[in-house]
Amino acid sequence: MVGLIDTFKEATALQCRFIEKLAQLDLKEVNAFADSLASFLGGQGDKKFVYGLAAGRSALSLYSFLQLLHNHLDVFPCTMEDPVQKHFRKTRNNLGIAVSGSGETPSVNKYIEDIIGQGGEMRLITANKDGTAYRLVEDYENGSVLIIKGRTKYDTEGGRISKLSPMGTEFELEVLAFLNAIFNEIPGRLNGEEGESENRSCDRYKDAVHDFSDQCHLISKMDPERLERWFKRLFPRSGRYVVGGVGRSGLVARAFEMRFTHLNKTSYWEYDFNTPSFQIGDVYVPITGSGNTYECFQGVRNAITNGADVMPITTNPSSELVELMNLLGREEDVAFIPVKPEYYDIFSRSKETSTWLVSEYSRMRYPIFEINASIFTNSVVAVGAEFLGMEEAGMKRLHA
């Protein structure tokens, strides 16, 4: 198992480099992107609709940002499940934000064309200047494009160590971190900070990127013996994998569940309509920073009652979920995501909710756990690919 721990650490270190790349983006482009968002959000009118146009894990990275906009600002978010034609009204302020690494996702390009055809504003984040999405938005007078040169599933670059960068991971992770970092720049612009766009230093953005990078390095220092036991419990099983989470943690969970499919495992998102009941041999993997999320806690009880294993991912050792796992003698089945000491108190203050409604605390807190959980689960996938003898080519064949 030493080789697997090395793979975990190398995969985590690689993702740290992905995050650190964001600090090297052209600040003029970062400023322009932040200004364009602030211009829309600070414009006249109280009916602001933001359409998130993306697919797969890119969509989950974008939807996390939409939650931030909805929680902190007076914005109504729409996703690809809410077609543009259904919600778009010219009496509203409409902004489409598209994320497409290749720029060739048909459904995304269709909705980009819809928004352009209706005269709405359009922003695109892509890795491909030669893609269709880039051409559509770059040629549009109310559109702008930001290039993040991250690897996508369409890349054929042979110089990368594929086992440490499962296809599609780099671009989606960088988009997730970028959008969470750029959000810190928006309030100052809405409050009328002085200075021309090109002269702004983007200190809040850069501080967030450095913070994400520091947090990422903590993951590579997780207890190797505990990780080894966790891997041994997680991978060698023939039962079904059920992954769950709520809010932004739920978006990370959905991305993680997709990767089990690529590892040729039978997996389900907990809240899908076709998710079966737990049975002996299954494993439930709830992802919850606080460890007190009502839905996850109830999912744990349900799984245990029906004979399934439970392997939570959390950051709060004093949570009710961890207390239950300790009571059952299954404390070794918990994976603890490390965060800086100053953040532990934030998670320990979160109390269990009594309904599906997310607490005010949970909605407003800094999304550091979701960034770390994304990095951790990506590294777990790299370990799983090696443990199960999966080659990247085989994983691609299982990719939608």
Could you describe each region identified by the protein language model?
Residues 5-16, 30, 34, 62, ...:
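A general structural signal for well-ordered alpha-helical segments in protein cores
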Residues 15-18, 33-36, 65, 111, ...:
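A ubiquitous structural signal for well-ordered alpha-helices
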Residues 38, 42-184, 246, 251-382:
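Glycine-rich phosphate-binding loops that contact phosphosugars or nucleotide phosphates
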Residues 181, 188-207, 379, 385-400:
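A short, charged, Gly/Pro-tolerant segment at domain boundaries
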Residues 1-25, 198-219:
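Generic N-terminal amphipathic, Lys/Arg-enriched alpha-helix
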Residues 41-42, 47-55, 197-211, 217, ...:
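Glycine-rich phosphate/diphosphate-binding loops and the adjacent beta-loop-alpha structural elements
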Residues 13, 17-24, 42, 74-75, ...:
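Generic secondary-structure signature for well-ordered alpha-helical cores
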Residues 23-46, 218-237:
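A short, well-structured juxtamembrane/interface segment
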